[in-house]
């Protein structure tokens, strides 16, 4: 439930952010995603929520490096699958003055082998 609340908070923040940046009454947003199951799911959920709010949503599938470059050049608006503090740390350091982290769905994300207790 805690993860769901965090995701909901991030999505509400995204809608607020997108509302501030829309011009000429045209509500558009571009969502980027990589081919990872959780990223695809979160991005499609965000797409559905934005469409319910009247946004025209563009979905952009790419690898991580081009996504960060696109975000930094304002060619894309949102990437929901940044793994911090470790996995995407170098990208965040490279583009930190051009990107804004507005929320988190999972704190201290790590990649590795997992063995249940």
PLM regions and their residue ranges:
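Short, well-ordered beta-strand elements
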Residues: 25-38, 55-60
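C-terminal motif of bacterial Sec signal peptides marking the signal peptidase cleavage site
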Residues: 16-19
């Amino acid at each position: 439930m805690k993860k769901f609340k965090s995701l909901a908070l991030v999505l509400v923040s995204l809608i607020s952010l997108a509302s501030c940046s829309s011009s000429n009454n045209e509500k558009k947003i571009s969502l980027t995603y990589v081919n990872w199951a959780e990223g695809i799911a979160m991005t499609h959920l965000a797409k559905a929520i934005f469409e319910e709010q009247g946004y025209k949503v563009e979905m952009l599938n790419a690898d991580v490096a081009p996504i960060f470059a696109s975000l930094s050049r304002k060619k894309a608006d949102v990437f929901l699958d940044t793994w911090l503090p470790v996995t995407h740390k170098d990208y965040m350091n490279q583009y930190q003055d051009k990107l804004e982290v507005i929320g988190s769905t999972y704190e201290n994300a790590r990649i590795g082998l997992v063995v249940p207790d």
